[in-house]
Each structure stands twice: as C-alpha cells, then as structure tokens.
C-alpha cells in the first residue's frame, strides 16, 4: 500500500525496496526472503492491526480499497490474498443474513398453511363430486315416480323438485369453481416451494465458509445478469406478440349472440371504430397546418396550454400529497406478512365450509363405515375450530384496513402518474407556441425526473436489483370473492364462535353498542362484518384551489376557504361502506335432501321492533314515478312499532337510513356517521315500545337484506337474524339453519345456499351473505325462497317454515334493502287458489293450526291496530296545531287511506272493531305516499288512489333543499326542508365550521386564511421582489443574477447522491442472480400458457366454432386476460410510449416514497429494499392462467 511522500516519512527496513509494475502500481520487494508484497512494511507501525482499532473510515493493516469501473468500490485483503465487494468495516452483511433466516421461518409457516388450505379444498372437491353423483341419481329416481316427487306432504324423505334442481346446478358449479381454484393453487404452491428452496440454497451458500464473492466472480455474475436481462426482454416482446394474436383471435369469435358475422381483422372491427375515429380527431387537433386565422389559432393554443399547465401542476401537487400519505402509513414488518395472516383466516373459513358440507351430507345409501368416518371428521373439525377461540383479531383488522388504504392510495398514485405523463406529452405537442412551459424547468418536474430515470437504468447493479427486477406494478388482480370472504371473517372481538358466525358484531351490540354507536341493525352488522370503519385521517388538502388570477408559480395559490374533512361528516363514507358490498361473494354450500314445501303466495311484512333492526335503504322516485309505478315492499321506510321520525322527502333525494333502538339512537345512512337524536320540547312525545311487547309477538321472523349491484351483475342476499324461534317446538338436540334459493333455478348460476347451523335459541344472529351472479332482467323473473330448516342429531332434516319474496319489484339501487319477514309454517302456507285472493295477507276462512297460534295472531293484530289509531290521532293533533301557522305542504289523505286499508286487511279476520277517523288530513310531504308503516308487500293496489290524489292536488310550494354547511347567506328560507337529525340544531351547528359569517371582499384574492397563503415569485432579483431584510437595491451589482441561469451543481448534492447509493454485498448479488433466473423461468411458463391458449383457439376456429370455449367464457381470469390483450392491441405507439413513461415515473415515485418513509419512520431504505428482494421469491401471482379442466 503506497504512502504519500513527506518529510516525516519513515524509511524502509533494511533489505526492502519500492518498485512499480507496468501499470504504475507500487509494490515492495523483500530481498531478504526474495518475495514481493503489496503491503508497505512500515504499515505495521502506523496502521491499526484489527478492525476494532480503526477510527472513522480507516482500514486496518493488510487491507486496501480499490475501484473497478464495472463493480465500483471493492476491497482487497492482502494477507489472505482475497477480494470482496462488501465493506469489511460495516456489519450490514451480518444483518442481511439474520433477516434472511428470520424470513425463512416465516415463509415456512406460510407454506405449511397454504398446503393445508390446498388439502382442505381437495376434501371439499371430493365431497362435492360424490354429492353431485348422488343428487343426480336421486333426481332420476324421483322423477320416475310422479307421485313421490310432487307429493305435497312435508316428510323429510321427499324431495322438492325445484329445490332439488337448484341443488344439482349449485353443486355442479361448486365443483367447477373448486377445480379452477385447485388448479391455480397448485401452480402457486409450486412457485412458492421453488422460491423457498431457492432462499434456503442462498442461505446455505452465503452463510457457510464462503465469505463472499471475489472481484472476478462478481464480474462474471454481472455478465450473466446482462444476458438474462436480454432474454427476459426478448421474452416480453414475444409475450406482447402473443397477446396481440389472442386479441385478433378473440375478435373473430362471436362473443355477442346477436352478431352473426365475424371480423377478419382487428383494426376493421366495428368495436374499435370509435377508437380509430377518436385518434384521427386527436391527430387532427395537433396539426399546425390547419387553415384559418393565425391569430385565433394562436390564442386558442395559448388558452389550451394554460389549461393544460394548470392541470399538470394540479396533477403534480396531487402526486406529492399521495406520496406523503403513503409514507405516513405504517409499513409491515415483512412484505407479504399480511398475506400470510389472510391465508390463515381463509383456512379457518375453508374448514368451516367443509364442516358445513359434512353436516349436510346425504346419509342415504351410505354404509355404516362411511357414516362413522364422516362423523369423526366432523368432530375433528369442530375441535380444531374451537381451538382458535383466543386468536386476536382487532389488531389484524386494523392492519388489514391500513393495507386496504395503502392499496387505494397506490391505485390513485398510479392513475395520477398516468395523467401526469399524458398531460406532459400534450404540453410537448403544443410547445411550438411562444409561451414557454415554466413547469418543465421547475424543481421536481417530469422532464428532469425523466432524465434521471433514464440515467438510473443503465445496467448498474442497483438498477438490476431494485428498479428493474423487483418492481411490480399494481396489475395483480385480487379475487373479489376471496377479498369479501376475508372482510366478512374479521370480527370485532376475537376467536371463533361455533354456535354463531364469525362476525364483527354480536346480537346485543346491534341494539346498543358503545364501540360503534353509529351503526345499528343490519346496516351496522354489514358495515362491521366487512371490517369497514371511517377512513383514516387523510392529509389535509390544499386550503385553496388553483386560482387563475395568480400568474405566479405559487405553492398554495389563493382560493376559497374550505372546511377540513374531519370537521363534519361527508357523504363519501357511506358510499365507501356500501362499496364493501360490491365485492363478489359466493358461498359454496353442500347439498342434502329436502322436504316438499308448498310455495308461499302471501305473507305479512312487519318492521323492526326494539330488538334492534334496520330500516330499508331505498332510493325514492320522483312524483311521476310514484304515481305510475306500483309500491314495492321496500317502501315501508317508517317503522310503526318504533319511535316515530319525520322524514321529509324531496325531489331526487335519497331516503335516509333510520335505525332505532332502545337507546333512541339513529344512524344517518347517507353519511355513515352516528348522531344521537335530540328531542325538542316543541315536538310530540314518541310512542314508547317496551321490551315486554316482544313477548306478545309469537310469529317467527327473519331479517333479510337485498341488494343488486348493476356494475358486477351481482344479487346480494343477507340473512341477518332470526327472532321468536319459540313459536316452533324444536328439540334441544336439533339445530336450525336457513336455506336460500333463487327459483326457478338456472344451470349456469349458483342459486341455492345454506347458512351455518345454530342451536335453537330465542333469537339467532346469522349475518350470512350470499351472492348470485345474474343479470337484472333475469332476476326480475325470479323468486327468492327462504326456508327455516332443522337438522336432528341423526342428521334428519325437516323444513319448519318459510317465506317467499318476489323479485319483480326489487329496487335496483346501490343501497341495501332490508325488511323483516314472517315465517309461515310449512303446513300453514296457503296455496294459490284464485286471483282475487292474491292481495290479501290472511285468507278470511283460513284455518289456524291451534289455539296458541290464534291467540298470538289476535294479540299482534290488536296491538297493530291500536298503534295505527294512535298515529292517526297524533297526526290529526299536529295538523290542528300547524294549520294556523303555515299552509299544508302536501296531501296525506292517501297516506291515511293506505293505513286504514292495511289495518282493515289485517283485522278482517278477527276482532278489533276499531274505527279510524274519516276526516283526518295531516300535513305531510308530497312523497309520503312511498313511506307507509307496517305496509305489506301486496299494497300496490292502492296505487291508483295515490296517483289520483296527486293529480287532483293543486300545485303547492315545493320545499327548497339548502346545504347548511356551505350556505353563507344570512337570509333563511321559511320553507326549508331539513332532515330530522338536523332539526335539533339547525342554526347553531353551522357556526363552528364557518370561519366568519360575514365575508369581506376587500381581502386579497379571496377570503381564505391568510396564514396558509404562500406566494413565491419566480423572477429575478429586482426591486419589486427584494425581501425587506436584504440590503437596498444597487444597480449593476454583482449579486444581480437571473434565476434562469443554470448554476453548477454544488458538492453537497453530489455527496448526497453518492450517499444514497446503497451498499452492495455478495448476498445482494446472489439474490439478484436468482431472482433473474426465477423471473425468466416464470416468464417461460407464461409464454407456454399463451401458446397453448392460442393453439386451442386456432383449432376451434379451424373446426368452424363461432364461440369461445365455455371454460374461457366462465373463468374471470381468462376474461381479464382477453380484455388486457384487446386493450394492448388498440393502443397506438404514442400511447405505448406514454405507458412506458408512466411506469418509469411510478418507479421513481416509489423510490421517493421509500425515502420519505425513511425520514418519517426511521426505517432505512436498504432494509426496505432487502425485505422486498426476499419476499419476491415467495410471491407467486399467476397472471396467465392455464387451460381450464374438463367440465363436470
């Protein structure tokens, strides 16, 4: 090691000589031993002998630092005659080895869990196949005997033909779904096992006697990495070609049955004609040779550039805010650790499904050994599920919510980067104008970041590992069924409850839950079941929006004052909670034999009592629709048996979800925010409903929620809870469950489901959600049948009661439609006799079962009629009080008429000779015809009366909807309509949110807060922009410099750039090599799958087929793949270039997020990067599915 010459230099020992080799490097000759050495013999006296004695960046005796243009800085150990790329003074390599060993234990546990999950799915598939065969045999056997199949008796040995058909089709679809899931899981398991073995080999290789790679080995690995990268690049090009060929093949098939011809070419297809037209229009708009006035064109170009510049600046500001929000979220210890927790929860769910299918297995034609084996398997599963009772879930639910928030922010960030890239390209196309694009030269602009991105991917070691190799875009599609099941499994307390479902809310919390007071009834149950809570506190948005008056490049331009998001409830939270139900959910139940049950033609529809239930969420029509369309069962928005709330409906306004409980609390359904109802002294006293009244109700009732999602064509059925089960005499050894069927059944839709079994108690909380993938037109021709069944200790099933719901008038809105339904006993269900009896709830001459049921119904009818009378009297009294103050706002004669008719229908059979007032006309809203308490589903025959009265009513003054939070006018409207929850504090509530009731327009620009307004001048140092603290302006001074002059890069920036480069180790190099090999292997599998799919489609096309295979049409993964291929084929070269630029920008943004997280959470970037590298091997996302298995 040569040293600098100096006056105080020690002389060489006797017999030593200094020399230089052919490249000028200094070495030393020991003539005494006739040897040469690179080590200066004088270093023994001047340098430390070990690393423990080193100070600062000092190297010990025998060590030297070198530089290689390909590798960079490396270190030489002259004593052992070795080289290495790690810095021997740092302990980073040891920390890497420790993290690798820790992750191996975590990955081994995850692999074991997924193998067990695969085994449980195999058991379910075998059981479903066996049950499918048995059901087919039973159908053939029963269909041969007409009397046995269509017998009207309720014996459990008979089959209902409709239920049996639905059972067979559902089992068949379950078999196909399990086959697809097992095929995908098998491939994922293979990839994860390979990745785990690779990590084990790396750990064994790098933690043994081998200390690290030498310089020559590192160079060889880099050369191999470059060759692998070239192979991967060529493979990606081949993948794009295969995707384009798939798009062309798909175009030749007839996806739509109405189209009778095939398109020979993708570019000439009518599907893409609008795309071609839009591109031509876009290209024409960007030409500069358009004839016309040059002045007009230049002014239009200038206005367009200003508009695009403002949008571009706003997009960059939004991107910066999203980066800050992402960096503030707590990062998980290991990437993918949350996926392991999800798989454990899904394993519990799969075991529950297997247990439920074993409970409903058909016992007929099975040997005694098979029955004993099935019983032993059931007991084993019950014990395993009981053992996870103490598993905590509150912290896991919070982590899952953070993960969902992170995914949402990442998706927004990706969309923002695409928008930014698009706007940048549009600004470049308009750069011929005289107006310069100031944003392109500003700090953090896309132009500067794009240049840095190009320089960061030049084949260096860092680029190969963190930027190019381990970056994965957000293109991984998550199975919505999987996600929704996971959300539904999350519970508020902890553990598994065998007698009830895994849910986040218990039965007593439905009525009065201190933890979630803003959720009650089914709304609260559903929101809690999906693990939904109000979103996390987001970073406050800019208080001022971009103002066109400011021509300066300001950080936060002036604008109107805004109220912070956390100050008052927003309507988006309710949309987010409802969005939880848009996830697809399909419960795979197993078949069993059923009893013959006659269909229900009529039923009583009662609303919720104080046991805690929810109102229906239905969207009001306008007045014309109210007069034309029949009333459906969801119009009962005001529950009679609960404390009354006045709901004033306006045109185009959605109804409010009102839920009442014992504690007199209500929920604002449109915002999802709890607010206690404050009774005013001027308001009337509410009709109290005590818990003792529950004992009067002797009819079993079930709470059912319905919802249709038009976007995903999914019909959601929610079995919430059951009450008054004591109406049926059920042995304590038996258990009860609900059987849900959508009839008539379809062969391509799962239409029969079962809930979990529960021991018989007075009230049971189910919270089971089922999904039916069906179109809206097909759903309107279906009937929902819900049966309450019991299963004995000897696995003998019996249908106790049931109800039927017509789906012809189902409100197709984005809200949950919830009502209570009476369960009529199977022996008591009326059959359809003639048309005049269809509108009646109870037939006048209908015989009752016994005197107990007669007394129960009589008491219920008496209580209902008395409550109706009380409501009429209160409304009449209210009208008399308000008649002298204001004119009526709408007729309520129709409302009272419907009340009287409903009451007459209910009490037609028995007692209650109660006369209702004839001349009662209370003031109520125009849309009150759609809010009828205690109205049954057959109340649509009153439509003509409602329409007649509405047409005959003279035009009245319509209430005006006023947003009190944003209104700045002092003049109040006397005819203003406010929701009941806003009635308590109408004027006092707005003041805490508004900064000043009087806006002074003399303030600068706008009345925003002055302390949040920052104006930065992007000008030279003239007297108009000189700060007050500086010296006075002196002309011709040397300090007068323009900010547009490009200054030289200071040394601090260079030092920061070199410090940001992470330290590379041999372990990093080995991980990069193995990850590249893994990526190449998986890419080859994807290419092979694409080739097989193309070959299959070409063979079908050659055979004259005009439709895609059924397995491809039914599999959502193939549908996503074909859509992606079609989208890529439609992209032009410019759009593809924009996509690549957006991807590069997204990589740069991800680096910025890591840097910000390092500053905020003190997590070193090198630790984050290394964890991502390790997790890459055990993440197996199958983007290209294999060909589906044969159908059943």
Curated annotation (Swiss-Prot):
Keyword hit for Metal-binding: no
Keyword Transcription: yes
Biased composition (Polar residues): 923-933
Compositional bias segments (type: Basic and acidic residues): 938-951, 1124-1137
Sequence positions bearing Phosphoserine: 286, 1022
Location within or outside the cell: Cytoplasm, Cytosol
Species whose genome carries this gene: Homo sapiens (Human)
Modified residues annotated as Phosphothreonine in this record: 1004
Lineage: Eukaryota, Metazoa, Chordata, Craniata, Vertebrata
Gene designation per UniProt: WWC2
GO molecular function: kinase binding; molecular adaptor activity; signaling adaptor activity
SMART domains: WW
Coiled-coil features, chain-numbered ranges: 121-194, 224-256, 302-421, 859-887, 1068-1144
GO CC terms: cytoplasm; cytosol
Annotated protein name in UniProt: Protein WWC2
Region (Disordered): 441-462, 873-895, 911-991, 1124-1143
Annotated GO biological process: cell migration; hippo signaling; negative regulation of cell population proliferation; negative regulation of hippo signaling; negative regulation of organ growth; negative regulation of transcription by RNA polymerase II; regulation of DNA-templated transcription; regulation of hippo signaling
């Amino acid at each position: 090691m040569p040293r600098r010459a100096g006056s105080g230099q020690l002389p060489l020992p006797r017999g030593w000589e200094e020399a230089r080799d052919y490249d000028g490097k200094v070495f030393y000759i020991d003539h005494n031993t006739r040897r040469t050495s690179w080590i200066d013999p004088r270093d023994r006296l001047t340098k430390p002998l070990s690393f423990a004695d080193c100070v600062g960046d000092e190297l010990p005796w025998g060590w030297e630092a070198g530089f290689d243009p390909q590798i960079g800085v490396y270190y030489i150990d002259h004593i052992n005659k070795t080289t290495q790329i790690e810095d021997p003074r740092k302990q980073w390599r040891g920390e890497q080895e420790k993290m690798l060993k820790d992750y191996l234990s975590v990955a081994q546990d995850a692999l074991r869990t997924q193998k067990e999950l695969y085994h449980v799915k195999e058991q379910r598939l075998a059981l479903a196949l066996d049950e499918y065969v048995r059901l087919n045999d039973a159908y053939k056997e029963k269909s041969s005997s007409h009397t046995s199949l269509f017998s009207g008796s309720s014996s459990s040995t008979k089959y209902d033909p409709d239920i049996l058909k639905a059972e067979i089709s559902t089992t068949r679809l379950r078999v196909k779904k399990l086959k697809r899931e097992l095929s995908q899981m098998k491939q994922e398991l293979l990839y994860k096992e390979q990745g785990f073995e690779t990590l084990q080999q790396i750990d064994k290789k790098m933690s043994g006697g081998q200390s690290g790679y030498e310089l020559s080995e590192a160079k060889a690995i880099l050369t191999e990495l470059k060759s692998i990268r070239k192979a991967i690049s060529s493979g990606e090009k081949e993948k794009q070609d295969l995707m384009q060929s798939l798009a062309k093949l798909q175009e030749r098939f007839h996806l739509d049955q109405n189209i009778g011809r095939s398109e020979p070419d993708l570019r000439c297809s009518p599907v893409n004609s609008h795309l071609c037209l839009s591109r031509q229009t876009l290209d024409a708009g960007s030409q500069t040779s358009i004839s016309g006035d040059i002045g007009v064109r230049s002014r239009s170009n200038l206005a367009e550039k200003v508009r695009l510049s403002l949008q571009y600046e706003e997009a960059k500001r939004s991107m910066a805010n999203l980066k800050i929000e992402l960096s503030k979220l707590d990062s998980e210890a290991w990437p993918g650790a949350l996926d392991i927790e999800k798989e454990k929860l899904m394993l519990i769910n799969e075991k529950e499904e297997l247990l439920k299918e074993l409970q409903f297995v058909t016992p007929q034609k099975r040997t005694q050994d098979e029955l004993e084996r099935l019983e032993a398997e059931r007991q084993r599963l019950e014990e395993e599920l009981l053992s996870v009772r103490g598993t905590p879930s509150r912290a896991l639910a919070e982590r899952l919510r953070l993960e969902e928030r992170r995914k949402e922010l990442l998706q927004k960030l990706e969309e923002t980067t695409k928008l930014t890239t698009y706007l940048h390209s549009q600004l470049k196309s308009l750069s011929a104008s005289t107006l310069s694009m100031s944003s392109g030269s500003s700090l953090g602009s896309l132009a500067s970041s794009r240049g840095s991105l190009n320089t960061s991917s030049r084949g260096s070691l860092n680029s190969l590992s963190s930027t190019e190799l381990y970056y994965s875009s957000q293109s991984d599609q998550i199975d919505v069924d999987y996600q929704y099941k996971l959300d539904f499994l999350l519970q508020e307390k902890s553990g598994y409850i065998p007698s009830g479902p895994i849910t986040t809310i218990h039965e007593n919390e439905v009525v009065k839950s201190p933890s979630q007071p803003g959720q009650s009834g089914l709304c609260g149950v559903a929101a809690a079941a999906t693990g939904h809570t109000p979103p996390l506190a987001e970073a406050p948005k800019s208080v001022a929006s971009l103002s066109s008056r400011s021509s300066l490049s300001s950080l936060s331009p002036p604008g109107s004052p805004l109220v912070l998001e956390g100050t008052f409830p927003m309507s988006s939270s309710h949309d987010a909670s409802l969005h939880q139900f848009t996830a697809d959910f399909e419960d795979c139940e197993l078949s069993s034999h059923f009893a013959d049950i006659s269909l229900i033609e009529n039923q009583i529809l009662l609303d919720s009592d104080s046991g805690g239930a929810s109102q229906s969420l239905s969207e009001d029509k306008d007045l014309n629709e109210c007069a034309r369309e029949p009333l459906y069962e969801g119009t009962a928005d005001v529950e009679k048996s609960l404390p009354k709330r006045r709901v004033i409906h306006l045109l185009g306004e959605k109804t409010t979800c009102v839920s009442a409980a014992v504690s007199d609390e209500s929920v604002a359904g449109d915002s999802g925010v709890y607010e206690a109802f404050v009774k005013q002294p001027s308001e009337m006293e509410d009709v109290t409903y005590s818990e003792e009244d529950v004992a009067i109700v002797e009819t079993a009732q079930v709470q059912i929620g319905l919802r249709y999602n038009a976007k995903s064509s999914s019909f959601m059925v929610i079995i919430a809870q059951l009450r008054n089960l004591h109406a049926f005499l059920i042995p304590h050894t038996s258990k009860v469950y609900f059987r849900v069927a959508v009839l008539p059944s379809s062969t391509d839709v799962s239409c029969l489901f079962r809930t979990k079994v529960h021991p018989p108690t007075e009230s049971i909380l189910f919270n089971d959600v089922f999904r039916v993938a069906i179109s809206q037109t097909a759903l309107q021709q279906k009937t929902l049948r819900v049966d309450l069944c019991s299963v004995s200790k000897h696995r003998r099933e019996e249908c106790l009661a049931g109800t039927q719901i017509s789906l012809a008038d189902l409100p197709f809105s984005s809200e949950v439609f919830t009502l209570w339904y009476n369960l009529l006993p199977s022996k008591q269900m009326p059959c359809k006799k003639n048309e005049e009896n269809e509108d009646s709830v109870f037939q006048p001459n209908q015989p009752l079962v016994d005197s107990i049921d007669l007394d129960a119904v009589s008491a219920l009818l008496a209580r209902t009629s008395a409550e109706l009378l009380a409501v009429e009297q209160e409304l009449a009294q209210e009208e008399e009080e308000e008649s002298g103050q204001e004119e009526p706002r709408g007729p309520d004669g129709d409302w009272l008429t419907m009340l009287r008719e409903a009451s007459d229908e209910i009490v037609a059979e028995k007692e209650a000779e109660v006369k209702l007032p004839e001349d009662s006309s209370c003031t109520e809203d125009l849309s009150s015809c759609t809010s009828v308490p205690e109205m049954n589903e057959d109340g649509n025959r009153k439509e003509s009366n409602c329409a007649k009265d509405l047409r005959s009513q003279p035009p009245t003054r319509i209430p005006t909807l006023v947003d009190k939070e944003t209104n700045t006018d002092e003049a109040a409207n006397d005819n203003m309509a406010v929701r009941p929850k806003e009635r308590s504090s109408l004027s006092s509530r707005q003041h805490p949110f508004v900064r000043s009731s009087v806006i002074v327009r003399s303030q600068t620009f706008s009345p925003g807060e002055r302390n949040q307004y920052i104006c930065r001048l992007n000008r030279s140092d003239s007297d108009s922009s000189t700060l007050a603290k500086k010296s006075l302006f002196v002309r011709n001074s040397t300090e007068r410099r323009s900010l547009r002059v490009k200054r030289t890069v200071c040394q601090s920036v260079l030092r920061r750039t070199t410090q940001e480069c992470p330290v590379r180790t041999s372990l990093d190099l080995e991980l990069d090599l193995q990850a590249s090999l893994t990526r190449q292997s998986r890419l080859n599998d994807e290419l092979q799958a694409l080739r097989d799919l193309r070959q299959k489609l070409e063979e079908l096309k050659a055979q004259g087929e005009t439709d895609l295979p059924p397995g491809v049409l039914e599999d959502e993964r193939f549908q996503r793949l074909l859509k992606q291929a079609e989208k890529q084929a439609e992209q032009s070269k410019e759009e593809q270039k924009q996509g690549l630029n957006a991807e590069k920008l997204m990589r740069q943004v991800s680096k910025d997020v890591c840097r910000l997280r390092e500053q905020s959470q003190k997590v070193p970037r090198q630790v984050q990067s290394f964890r991502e590298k390790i997790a890459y091997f055990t993440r197996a996302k199958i983007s290209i599915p294999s060909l589906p298995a044969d159908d059943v």
